[in-house]
Swiss-Prot record:
Keyword check for tRNA-binding: no
UniProt xrefs under CDD domains: Ribosomal_uS17
GO CC, one annotated term: cytosolic small ribosomal subunit
UniProt family annotation: Belongs to the universal ribosomal protein uS17 family.
Membrane spanning stretches: none
Protein name: Small ribosomal subunit protein uS17
Database matches in HAMAP family: Ribosomal_uS17_B
The species this protein was found in: Bradyrhizobium sp. (strain ORS 278)
Cited function: One of the primary rRNA binding proteins, it binds specifically to the 5'-end of 16S ribosomal RNA.
Assembly behavior: Part of the 30S ribosomal subunit.
Amino acid sequence: MPKRTLQGVVVSDKQAKTVVVRVDRRFTHPIYKKTIRRSKNYHAHDESNEFKPGDMVWIEESKPISKLKRWTVVRGEHKKTA
């Protein structure tokens, strides 16, 4: 079975080798037919402490690394600075 991959934005990098990634999803409400946005935060392993808040990253499922970490950062794009 292939590993799931999600795309999100880094919201925190305060932990060592860990980033918190916000993943947004959109769906249509089954009764009201309105498009709704929901988000969820995932703790992901960042071995090189490379990513900072605002960066776009892709995370992939992995075996449990700690109590909260079950995802690993695969690749990312750094936020453009002016």
